[in-house]
């Protein structure tokens, strides 16, 4: 008996030790820095769209485009334990173990609009392969692809969302027959009348009556199942509204607002409640970032689609770009936060710069005039500008900022003489760099988010950004890493003195970079400062300008008609008379004392308040709300877009909106539907995939990037953390599942951990994200409708396109 007691004590001690090890290691930040690929699981023949660990951590479930489910035995080297041929005829988007079923029951949802329940105990044949004999239930209520399944913790009920705009609740114990209409008792939320597709649904584990949904609408919605009128069958009619089915109690949006354009081009790819902290909700937007919300946040915004001013809102920490609450996709918090906490507030403007006067020059004339600010030859104004006369300097700054604003927001594109898009982007970047360099020459100049160099534009811009940040006191000397110069740049680069073109300052990029790196950070004399600003950076500007085909502006300018004057800045007097200051402008400048010298323009009363989003260097301006109204009132009648916008504005109009408390950036979420997840013993980390084939892990509290791991050849869409062990399962476009932990040390040069190269990765992703934010999206509903209208038949009554086969993940 004593031997048995000793064995029991040993078992208890072993269990206690294992639990302690799990608590100490699981989600440890030190472990995260050493994470790498352990194993790659092969068995699927299509993209793996869904992963789910069993509650005990013994099995991993995966579902794929090949319509099969595989259950992997975790503690038997991840060998396949069960292979299920589901009978689905389209991609499997979601698959989950049913709680309390001893890992024997599995739910699956597919693009064929079906939800199926499989019971492995019902298989009559032994072995690993299973077929339709294991299917015990099938629900066919949805009118479109079923995207997500969330099992309830009771083991009987589960929630689903579909691209038909509905969220539904089922009970596996109850029989259910449906004729695929909207008169169905399973419906909790019905957004079908608003033409909204739902992509994600999540339920709070601690408060299971709360669930959140998101899709092709800029808001995420929180619902309370306790307010569902399930007892009154008469309430379920064809005209059932979301308010009658289930009550929405909160909406979520970054900064608590969205603009009109966002109603159509922004959508949510994933929502996820925290298991450890029921008040926390993660939401991921396409072409945007991951945001953390507090469900019961006291501070909420009045729901509106107009511009929201919150002058009392204080930023969480000082930064260079302390702006208006961030209006989506225009400039990045990555750039904002990397400007550091030490930035003088006097150099900061809260709003993007906005011109206060009409355009007086063609764009080619603007180029010629701005060139004069940095040259001394051929009537150059450089010496006059830097001579110390504030009126010269402030007006030159205003002129460049106006040029940026006009080119960003000019939307007239002639059919025959269209301005090359790459030239437009190059010009905007160059003029932004001009503003940054001018800001170094005078301490009273403020920077706006649309007038600053951003990382990722190229190695020379990165170098100028590095120098500018350092000289402005924005970051320490080594705070910014650079992308390496290209081979062409190494061969052709020669930087000459802008005042003495025959004098070579640097003959290759490496020489210039090393020279700046050797600067004594504690002793930057005025002579050195003058050299790097007025010689090196000014020379870089002229070098960049020489590579831009400015002549392409001329034929485009000739077809424009909004220029009020064609006067050039031929001399200093012409320059001063052309830029006539507004009333009290000189007094404003002279009394600025370091404040924004153009603040009077950013709040000009004539500006369109609905134009919340300034367009950066790669975008064209969109129609404002006023434009939408005028379209609706035109002789041609309302447009499809205006009608859709009106419908989506009407979704839950009186529900309070919560703003985010944290944002996580660095990844790119444009090309596919990606999930987002918590990780750690107390959900202290945030994880998301990226279009570059990597996945990111952030510290939840300070939003810093802890790890960047390569997980797929194209894009990582799914990341799931093991419930007990420090292990991650990752999948994406590849047909394999990757298992990541720290058990294996990869050979030198073979590591998938790319955290050390974070700067270049983040900069590249930011550029791709901004480009993707301007690409129009198209849903499967839209694609099917277009296909139906365009290809009903081939003219002889023969169908040439199966619209039901059109599906987008």
From Swiss-Prot:
Main location: cytoplasm
Per-repeat ranges for WD: 43-82, 87-128, 141-180, 193-233, 241-295, 668-708, 711-750
Repeat keyword on record: yes
Protein name from the UniProt record: WD repeat protein iqw1
SMART domains according to UniProt: WD40 (SM00320)
Pfam families: WD40 (PF00400)
Region ranges (Disordered): 599-644
Superkingdom, taxonomy of origin: Eukaryota
InterPro entries: DCAF8, WD40/YVTN_repeat-like_dom_sf, WD40_repeat_CS, WD40_repeat_dom_sf, WD40_rpt
Alphabetic keyword roster: Cytoplasm, Repeat, WD repeat
GO biological process, one term: negative regulation of fatty acid biosynthetic process
Gene3D superfamilies, alphabetized: YVTN repeat-like/Quinoprotein amine dehydrogenase (2.130.10.10)
Function: Ligand-dependent coactivator of nuclear receptors that may function as a substrate receptor for CUL4-DDB1 E3 ubiquitin-protein ligase complex.
Compartments, record wording: Cytoplasm
CC terms in the record's Gene Ontology section: Cul4-RING E3 ubiquitin ligase complex; cytoplasm; cytosol; nucleus
Stretches with biased composition (Acidic residues): 608-636
Keyword Cytoplasm: yes
Subunit field text: Interacts with ddb1.
